[in-house]
Amino acid sequence: MGNKQTIFTEEQLDNYQDCTFFNKKDILKLHSRFYELAPNLVPMDYRKSPIVHVPMSLIIQMPELRENPFKERIVAAFSEDGEGNLTFNDFVDMFSVLCESAPRELKANYAFKIYDFNTDNFICKEDLELTLARLTKSELDEEEVVLVCDKVIEEADLDGDGKLGFADFEDMIAKAPDFLSTFHIRI
């Protein structure tokens, strides 16, 4: 008549704890959140490691993401299937990277992926324009957008190639004191 959870094996829970910044209680809470997204799709028993993909369209409706202008980009950055659908492992990874205790370097890596719209491993002027459009809801005129993008590249482009590589981006993030406090969501 115990109160023992039967969603995961102890080994699975230990593995999640080893690979994330979460404890057992957090993992079970994440499963509950994942289950709530698609109760007809997500099983209550993960002991046999089922592979279930919850569609991006459901994930971006979560309160933590719903109003975020980068919600699709965030989910896509953690999706292993390339379509933006998340398995439970992907879902846990997303919350782990975006939790308060994740290190700056890990967060910077995923932030870079989110802002690299054309996936060329650089943040170019076009990526910055798309970022600005989302952040300002396209309220800046074309001249203002060009000015801001040029200024960002001028200040952050350490090697002078006209675009931001990961090292440039990481250096820029290191100078942004609010990056860690804004690049997170709570479970």
Curated annotation (Swiss-Prot):
This is Calcium and integrin-binding family member 2. InterPro entries: CIBP, EF-hand-dom_pair, EF_Hand_1_Ca_BS, EF_hand_dom. CDD domains: EFh. The lineage of its organism: Eukaryota, Metazoa, Chordata, Craniata, Vertebrata. Transmembrane segments: none annotated. The gene is CIB2. Changing V75M: Found in a family with deafness; uncertain significance; the patient also carries a likely disease-causing mutation in PDZD7. Changing E64D: In USH1J and DFNB48; decreases interaction with TMC1 and TMC2. Residues 66-101, 103-138, 144-179 form the EF-hand domain. It is linked to Deafness, autosomal recessive, 48: A form of non-syndromic sensorineural hearing loss. Sensorineural deafness results from damage to the neural receptors of the inner ear, the nerve pathways to the brain, or the area of the brain that receives sound information. DFNB48 patients have prelingual onset of severe to profound sensorineural hearing loss affecting all frequencies.
